[in-house]
Amino acid sequence: EKGCPYRNPIDGESWKLGDATVTVVYDGFQGTTYNECSIVLRVTCGGKSLLLTGDLPSTMEKQLLAKGYNFKADVLKVGHHGAGSSSCTAFIKAVQPQYAIISSSRASTARLPRASVLKRLALQFVKVYRTTDKDVVFNFIDGKISTPNKESIKYTCIKNGTIALSSKVFRSKGKAITPSVSLVVNGKVVSPSEYKIKYSSNKNPGVAKVKLTGLDKKFVGTCTTTFMILPKKETIKTKTVKLNKIKLGWEGQKNVTGYYLKYSTSKSFKKNVKYKIFNNEKNLNTTIKGLSFNKKYYFSVRAFKSNIGDGKWSKTISLKTEKLPIPTKGFFTEIIEKTKSIKLQWKKQSSKYDAGYMIQYSPDKKFKDDVETVTIKKVSKNSFKLKKKPKTKDYYIRVKGYNKYCNGKWSKVKKVKFAD
């Protein structure tokens, strides 16, 4: 109306309109283009608020956000009739609206609002209402918002959907595991043609991921879930027995924490069970020492993954340790008696495990008093010269072999004396 007085408002200015309060959030003075100069108003009533953004473009939205402007509101009147150049994702996140109103004429439905804007709103779970369908009415009463209008749903975000898998726990099998998928959004099953599936970390033991991405036809956004892959059943591959030592090797797996080995003289592992833990996936063999000789043992191994679980025990194998390598009984082969010495010679031990010999001599036939013991630590040396001591003429002697596992039996006792 001509002659009507007017003035430009400034940031922070507010005035009352009945029960509502109108506040200037942005006065438009910082803009350099017509749209950037759009005034942004917040209307507050009944404890709820509506943000009116005019034709404010994303360029100015971002500038104002960077300067700390507060655009928080319950309802957003989408900028520039839903043009793609307005209502950027960062701006929508800053407003945090529950509802959005898009004002555009019925004649422009083919052009506005843009699909990109509708997708951005859907990704933030904002309910959209459009004036192209019907005049939009919102009631702000006592801190509650109501509307007789129906939501205009073109895109639905699947982020908060529920993914059902054929199973949540699998065992590794050396190849990718791809459980079947079902997606439910807002209580309805979504057709598999509406999203694509991507599996990751789904081969080796650990936590595998499933990511569904809407194909932007009706559904947008992503929805994720996980499932567990336990280690596979282990296999003992190599085994070696040497005396009372047993060396085992197993197949091994990738991406496990390590392995458990159990062994026992009980086939059922109900008693006398011992365990070894290997906290390295590359530790694929071990040697168990100090076992009983000539004894059967049972072995099984399994992999484990910390915070995930254990694999199945391998097939039990049995191995028997070798017999105790007892040196043969000592036997003198030659005794040469001289005045000041006596040369002793005995049969050599033949076992590769034998370490040497022990000779004892004493004037006491029962070897209880004045016993002297000589240890020879070379199995190849099978002789010894016994030297005469003052006032000692006769000796009783005996010899035996020994190794690191045990001693042989003493030879028959021989009586020797120094020649006159």
Where are these regions (language model features)?
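Beta-strand-rich modules
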Residues: 290-308, 389-407
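Short S/T/G- and acidic-enriched coil/turn segments that sit immediately N-terminal to beta-strands
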Residues: 282-286, 380-384
